[in-house]
């Protein structure tokens, strides 16, 4: 019995060595206005607000989060804001920034001049969150700091806030999401001008969004 207890104890210790440094996106919050979609369909690329939260369990003894911040700055707008605070189980890094939204035709040229790790691709009024080549490069650089550091998608929680500034009613559609803490297999909600709706995509191991990109559709 004592042998089993000691064995289990060392298993926990060994696992902890791998778990403690882990730092991956906990939450993404993205805000889109319906008029932005119309502008994108006309050929524009628009930077939309993005807020990201990372959590690091345990102490950051090697100052890995500040180092990760310096790397991330190369791939984000100059006015991006970074904050590192103490959480319940470790440090939390919050980034307030923006990512480009455009079509498959307009985004490549924009990204050449403005490297970003993420982008929103609009196709037939469907909004798809995708990673870019810059994210792959960033992740490679992060692993040089700590092999457990990563900014891979999907985040544990991705929240889209859709606000209507269109004269006509707009309908938001999504699959396997939460809204107002309620689960929906097929979500559909119409919003009037100056109204908004939040849709949350869960990114756990059993989530469909481990296999396909986070996406929703608007009927304008």
What are these regions (language model features)?
Residues 75-220:
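Mature, soluble, non-transmembrane domains
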Residues 31-52:
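Post-signal peptide N-terminal segment of mature Sec-exported envelope proteins
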Residues 19-22:
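C-terminal motif of bacterial Sec signal peptides marking the signal peptidase cleavage site
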Residues 2-10:
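Bacterial N-terminal signal peptides that target proteins for export
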Residues 24-26:
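Bacterial signal peptide processing site
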């Amino acid at each position: 019995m004592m042998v089993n207890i000691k064995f289990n104890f060392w298993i926990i210790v060994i696992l902890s060595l791998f778990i403690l440094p882990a730092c991956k996106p906990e939450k993404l919050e993205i805000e889109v206005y319906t008029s932005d979609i119309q502008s994108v369909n006309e050929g524009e690329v628009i930077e939309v607000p993005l807020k990201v939260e990372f959590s690091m369990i345990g102490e950051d003894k090697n100052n890995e989060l500040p180092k990760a911040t310096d790397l991330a700055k190369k791939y984000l707008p100059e006015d991006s804001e970074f904050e590192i605070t103490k959480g319940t189980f470790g440090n939390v890094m919050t980034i307030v920034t923006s990512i480009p939204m455009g079509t498959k035709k307009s985004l490549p040229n924009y990204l050449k001049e403005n490297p970003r790790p993420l982008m929103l691709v609009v196709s037939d009024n469907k909004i798809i969150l995708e990673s870019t080549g810059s994210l792959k490069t960033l992740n490679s650089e992060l692993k040089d700091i700590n092999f457990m550091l990563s900014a891979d998608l999907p985040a544990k929680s991705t929240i889209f806030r859709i606000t209507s500034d269109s004269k006509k009613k707009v309908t938001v559609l999504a699959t396997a999401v939460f809204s107002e803490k309620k689960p929906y297999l097929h979500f559909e909600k119409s919003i009037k001008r100056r109204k908004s709706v939040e849709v949350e995509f869960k990114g756990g191991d059993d989530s469909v969004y481990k296999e396909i990109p986070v996406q929703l559709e608007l009927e304008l």
